Structures are given as structure tokens and as C-alpha cells.
Amino acid sequence: MKFFVFFVLLFSIDLKSHEFNPAHLVVDQLDSEKFIYEANWMYPFKNIGKRGEIIFPDECKTESSDLYYQGKYINEKIYLDCTKSLKGLYIEVINLSVLTDALITVNFADDDTFEGIVNNKNSIIKIPIKENYLPTAYIFLGLDHLLNGF
């Protein structure tokens, strides 16, 4: 009987939750001696408002391929040809909705990795010159989401 009451109470609770589905930008340096990068911008298509857009540094020429759907995301491949490394430069994400944060991952050819988070309040992020050894941004984003309720 206690088991039955437990399940009735458990499933009668009205939970106010939504899917945690952040946007994700993954930038990979293709050559350790050249500043050529390939980026994949993954933005959830079930989102409120405009699709978020990436603003890369002025030091980079960009070329984008056509958008395509994969799973829950609209994907965009972006090719960057930069005059110098992305280290020390800024990336901006515009048009993020209140419910969508963006995880940014930059993988350099020398095995350095940077991870950071942007949102609609803090839309610009600086890629540090020194590497980020612990890629914890996604973990902290999830914890913040759980603890703050959005």
C-alpha cells in the first residue's frame, strides 16, 4: 500500500520543467601553422525568436555553408581564414533568447582547448591566450539551470 501511495504522490506532482537544450559553437583549428578554422554552429530549432548568429573577429574572413537540420538543431558550417590566432580575440553571439545559452568550444591544433558560455546578457566572450585546462562550462551551465529553475 505504501508503494502505491508513493507512486500516486510522485506522479501527481505538477513539475514545471522544460528541456535543457543550449546552443553550441564548436571551432576546430585545421592546421597548427595556419589560422584556418572550421566551425559548427548548432542552434536549437524549437526556440523563441530569431536564430542566434555568430560574430567572429574582424581578423577572420568567414564563409558559411547552407543550413541543415540534424536532430534538434539547425546546423551551420562556417569556415574561417584568420590573419592571426583566435587566442586573445573575441567572439560574439547575437539574438540569443532568454531561455537559450550558448556553449562555445575552441579546439586549437596544438591541443589547447577553450570552453565558455554566452547568453543574452553577456553575449561577448574573450578567448584567453592560455589554455583552459578543465572544460567545465557545460557542467556549470547545467547546475545553474537546475538551481535557478530556468
Enumerate the language-model features and the residues they cover.
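Sec-dependent N-terminal signal peptides
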Residues: 2-13
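Histidine-/acidic- and/or cysteine-rich, low-complexity loops and terminal segments associated
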Residues: 15-147
